[in-house]
Curated annotation (Swiss-Prot):
Subcellular localization, as worded in the UniProt entry: Cell membrane; Bacterial flagellum basal body
Native species: Caulobacter vibrioides (strain ATCC 19089 / CIP 103742 / CB 15) (Caulobacter crescentus)
Major localization listed first in the record, in broad terms: membrane
The protein, known as: Flagellar biosynthetic protein FliQ
Domain of life of the organism encoding this protein: Bacteria
Length: 87
C-alpha cells in the first residue's frame, strides 16, 4: 500500500466520521438555539432547561438516522475489505 492509498483511506475515514456525526450535531445545535432563543425572549434563566429537550432530540435523531449511519459504515467497511483483498 502506497502513501497515497493510505492518505486516501484516511481522508475517506474522516469524511465518514463527519457524515456520521453531522445529523446528530445539527439537531443538537438547532434545538439548543431554539431553547436559547426561547429563554432570551421569556427571560427564563434556568440553566437546566436546555438539557432535557436536547437529550430527547438527540435520542430521536439517533433513532431516525441510525439506518443511514449503518449503511454508511457498512459501505466503508466493504470498501476497506475490497482494498485489503486487492493487495
Amino acid at each position: 500500500m502506497t502513501g497515497a492509498e493510505v492518505l486516501d483511506v484516511g481522508r475517506d475515514a474522516i469524511w465518514l466520521t463527519l457524515q456520521l456525526c453531522a445529523p446528530v450535531l445539527i439537531v443538537g445545535l438547532v434545538v439548543g438555539v431554539i431553547i436559547g432563543l426561547f429563554q432570551a425572549l421569556t427571560q427564563i434563566q434556568e440553566a437546566t432547561l436546555v438539557y432535557a429537550p436536547k437529550i430527547v432530540a438527540i435520542f430521536i435523531s439517533l433513532l431516525i438516522f441510525l439506518p443511514l449511519m449503518g449503511s454508511l459504515m457498512s459501505g466503508f467497511m466493504r470498501q476497506i475489505a475490497a482494498r485489503i483483498a486487492g493487495m
